[in-house]
Amino acid sequence: MTIALGKFTKDENDLFDIMDDWLRRDRFVFVGWSGLLVFPCAYFALGGWFTGTTFVTSWYTHGWASSYLEGCNFLTAAVSTPANSLAHSLLLLWGPEAQGDFTRWCQLGGFWTFVALHGAFGLIGFMLRQFELARSVQLRPYNAIAFSAPIAVFVSVFLIYPLGQSGWFFAPSFGVAAIFRFILFFQGFHNWTLNPFHMMGVAGVLGAALLCAIHGATVENTLFEDGDGANTFRAFNPTQAEETYSMVTANRFWSQIFGVAFSNKRWLHFFMLFVPVTGLWMSALGVVGLALNLRAYDFVSQEIRAAEDPEFETFYTKNILLNEGIRAWMAAQDQPHENLIFPEEVLPRGNAL
């Protein structure tokens, strides 16, 4: 039996092909299909943040100033979260809360959901951009995989955590001092520094910084020279095709320092990828746990003994008292609508403060 294979011809004017050709053609700044997501989302997220920090107050949601117009500076300005009473509303401009009134939308905290959602999709689009470009030039997708770590942290902190709580109100506001305040909140209400997932995150970030410094210094130490002159390092020539540093020399150096060293570049660079990415992912998982109000380590026996014996204190019991102080102060400040009044006997006391 003979089977005839005919070549399938597509319409040369097919809209998808025209779009694909224009989006993926070689240009100074690659656009790609991912660009349809990342460019508008990044534009709106950054534009919303600059607009919010410049003009929009937090008086109606938090009871304080947060814009340059009110006297804040770069460190104290922020796009603040919506009020606690708005729960998890998307706060669309045309929604039932603002009803198309832009001024009211700003007063209710609409810029926060605007920046958070466009920012999240912008970051996801940037990861897809790396994946798309890597596929176009036949690279492995490890850049996109690595960038998934900061995306996981952003989504867990700004979206998943407040979704697990009573509203967007408990997410961080977009500002420098606002993030610091959120860190204090995490410590006071969740004892975050004693959480093992936070410990893994710190180990990953600081470990990656150490690996980066060691790696950069080692490569600089073992650069090849092409002569006796002080300024003839061929390694700084971008057109040099061959190796620019000696892995063998680096291996011998660290073998003498530590007794062990990386035997090849692939394992070395995979380790430099693995440490920060794993640390950030573990930290993101920990924040998801906090969204569900899961506890960190609780050394109850030390707390009981400290309560019974005034002379017994540990760094842990001192930190627990500090956390109580944070909660007592922040709850009343953050939720003025609750009219929280704490009697003297519930405020932190003892020799820790």
Swiss-Prot record:
Signal peptide, first to last residue: none
Binding annotation for chlorophyll a PD2: 198
Keyword NAD: no
Cell compartment(s), UniProt: Plastid, Chloroplast thylakoid membrane
Predominant subcellular localization, coarse grouping: plastid
UniProt binding sites for a plastoquinone: 215, 262
Cofactor note: The D1/D2 heterodimer binds P680, chlorophylls that are the primary electron donor of PSII, and subsequent electron acceptors. It shares a non-heme iron and each subunit binds pheophytin, quinone, additional chlorophylls, carotenoids and lipids. There is also a Cl(-1) ion associated with D1 and D2, which is required for oxygen evolution. The PSII complex binds additional chlorophylls, carotenoids and specific lipids.
Database matches in SUPFAM superfamilies: Bacterial photosystem II reaction centre, L and M subunits (SSF81483)
Keyword field: Acetylation, Chlorophyll, Chloroplast, Chromophore, Electron transport, Iron, Magnesium, Membrane, Metal-binding, Oxidoreductase, Phosphoprotein, Photosynthesis, Photosystem II, Plastid, Thylakoid, Transmembrane, Transmembrane helix, Transport
Phosphothreonine modifications at: 2
Transmembrane parts of this sequence: 41-61, 125-141, 153-166, 208-228, 279-295
Additional record remark: 2 of the reaction center chlorophylls (ChlD1 and ChlD2) are entirely coordinated by water.
Family membership: Belongs to the reaction center PufL/M/PsbA/D family.
Subunit text: PSII is composed of 1 copy each of membrane proteins PsbA, PsbB, PsbC, PsbD, PsbE, PsbF, PsbH, PsbI, PsbJ, PsbK, PsbL, PsbM, PsbT, PsbX, PsbY, PsbZ, Psb30/Ycf12, at least 3 peripheral proteins of the oxygen-evolving complex and a large number of cofactors. It forms dimeric complexes.
Role noted for this protein: Photosystem II (PSII) is a light-driven water:plastoquinone oxidoreductase that uses light energy to abstract electrons from H(2)O, generating O(2) and a proton gradient subsequently used for ATP formation. It consists of a core antenna complex that captures photons, and an electron transfer chain that converts photonic excitation into a charge separation. The D1/D2 (PsbA/PsbD) reaction center heterodimer binds P680, the primary electron donor of PSII as well as several subsequent electron acceptors. D2 is needed for assembly of a stable PSII complex.
Name of the molecule in the record: Photosystem II D2 protein
Native source organism of the sequence: Populus deltoides (Eastern poplar)
Lineage: Eukaryota, Viridiplantae, Streptophyta, Embryophyta, Tracheophyta
